[in-house]
Amino acid sequence: MHKFTVALDCDEVLNNLIEKTLELYNARHSTKLTLDSFTDYDFYKCLSFEEAEDLTAMFLEKELWDSLSPAPHSQWGVKTLIDKGYDVYVATATHHTNFPWKVDWIIKNFPLIDEKHIICIHNKSLLRADVLVDDCAENLISTSPLVDRICFDKPWNRNVYDDAYHIYRAHNWEEIVEQIDTCYKDSI
């Protein structure tokens, strides 16, 4: 029997990478950037070139990954999905230099996710999951409409009209779990 497969993005789904990066960035540069400053997934469209360069370079710093916490209720959500029998994967589009730190972070904070279930993939349309949960609208839009897609609400994806793309929107982990349950029930 087919096990219902869930692919979860890491950054901004399992963690709040942007918020933590902004915290460190603001401390270093005496700025007051907030999450709402990011109205586009492409930082270069909503920040100055220098700010975008500095901020994206920080993603490659081990210090960031060492200080990063899981997103609220994400550990509960992952445990709940696994306890319900879903086959849970982490599918992350990441730079190869920080992939080891990210894998270590996932293993430390989500020990129920098997290391073999952590995938580095830039083109998420290649995934063969039943559900994809992501904050990047482009990843969701490019994925087959045969895959249930859940957009984790962030300022940079609010321009995506869920009905136009048949994408569900979730504002928290409780809604993610509820929507995955609905997708599963609709598939049987």
Regions found by a protein language model. Name each.
Residues 63-69, 74-106:
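Substrate-recognition element of Asp-dependent hydrolases with the DxDx(T/V) motif
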Residues 85, 115, 129-130, 146-147, ...:
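Short, well-ordered alpha-helix to beta-strand connector turns
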Residues 105-121, 163-182:
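Structural recognition of alpha->loop->beta junctions
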Residues 33, 39-79:
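Metal-dependent phosphoesterase signature
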Residues 133-171:
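Acidic, Mg2+-coordinating phosphoryl-transfer loop and its flanking beta/alpha structural elements
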